[in-house]
Amino acid sequence: MRTIALLTLATLFAAGAASAQDAAKAAAPPRAKTPPHATVSILEPKNGAHVGQDVLVKFGAKNISVAPATDTAPGTGHHHLLIDAKELPPLDAPIPADATHKHYGKGQTQDTIHLEPGDHTLQLDFADAAHMQFNPPIVSKKITIHVK
């Protein structure tokens, strides 16, 4: 009897976990279609640059409008800077806000970031008002900088 009760609880737990995952995916806003020829780039620093710990990063965008996250107009969005990210964030959820994913929801096109000495990678990821990546994602080339 105890085995049946444990199996029943395990089954209910697994079903609940699957339902929670399905609900989270269903709740994610749809991804906006990428405007034709939209690109983003890191204008400064250049790939391979040797920089101090306070790094001015300038963002570029072409064929898409940079706007605050409150602007929900089609074809607009804002930058996210990925710092030392191994891969892009999941496409079915908003870009997280943490030390690896910096949000620029006020429509900023540059920032000074502080990095510890060593090699670091930087990449831009452009998203809509809901912090969802476009479809397909609008990302810059990943660059590596050397911090003194």
Residue ranges and their predicted role:
Residues L7-L12:
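Classic N-terminal secretory signal peptides
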